[in-house]
Amino acid sequence: MKPLKGKIALVTGGSRGAGRAIAVELGKAGATVYMTGRSIRGASTNQWPGTIDDTVSQIEASGGKGIAVRCDHTNDSETEAVIAKIREEQGKLDILINNVWGAHDLGVEAKPFWELSLKNWDTMFTAGVRAQLATNHFAVPLLRENKQALIIHTTFWDENKYTGQFYYDLAKNAIVRMAYGLSLELKRDNIAVLAVSPGFMRT
C-alpha cells in the first residue's frame, strides 16, 4: 500500500540531512518527489557530501520516483522556474516541504550578539527565511488549485526557549511565525501548514 501514490511533492534543500530523509520517505510512500538544492553530482556545495542526484538514486533504490532540479532559492527566477516545471510536467503540487536553509555556509557561532557579524542577518534571513518565503510565494497558487494540500516548514523551536545564538533564534522563530500566518491565510483553501522542528542538525 502506497498512501501517497499519485501525489506530487516538492522538497527544497534535498541534498542531505533532513531534506534528503524526508524526500526518500515520501518516495517510499508513493509520491513523485521533486527536490531542489545547489549540490549536484560533480559540483557539491563547499565539497560537502551529498547531492540532489544522490537523493534521487536513493529514492529510486527504494522503488520510488525522484526528480532533481538544481536551484538556488535566493534567486527568485530559479525558484519560480521550479514551480513552473512542476506545473508543466505534473499539472499540480500536493505537498511542499520547505526545508531550504542556505545559512549552513556561514555556520552558527556561539558568541554574544555584539560580537557577531551583521552578515549573520544577511545570510540567515536571505538564504533561510526569505528563501522559504519566496518558495511559498511561487508555490501557493499551484497548491491552491487542489482540493487539499500540505505545506511543512522545517525549523528549530523549543517551546520559546532561546536557541543561544541571536540571529539564528530570530530566523528560526520567523519561520515558525511564517507557518502560523500561512495556516490562517490558507485555511479556507484547505491547505494545512505546519512548522516541524527535528532538532539541530549540522548538515
Model-derived regions: residue spans:
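Canonical Rossmann dinucleotide-binding motif of NAD(H)/NADP(H)-dependent dehydrogenases/reductases
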Residues: 3-40
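Flexible cofactor-recognition loop at the NAD(P)H-binding site
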Residues: 16, 38-39, 95-108, 156-157
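Conserved amphipathic alpha-helix within the SDR
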Residues: 56, 60, 67-70, 76-91
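A glycine-rich helix->loop->beta "capping" turn
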Residues: 62-65, 85-98, 104, 117, ...
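Active-site Tyr-X3-Lys motif and surrounding loop/helix of classical short-chain dehydrogenase/reductase
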Residues: 81-88, 107-126
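Catalytic loop of short-chain dehydrogenase/reductase
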Residues: 102-106, 114-120, 144, 148-188, ...
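A short, exposed helix-loop element centered on a Lys and neighboring polar residues
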Residues: 136-137, 180
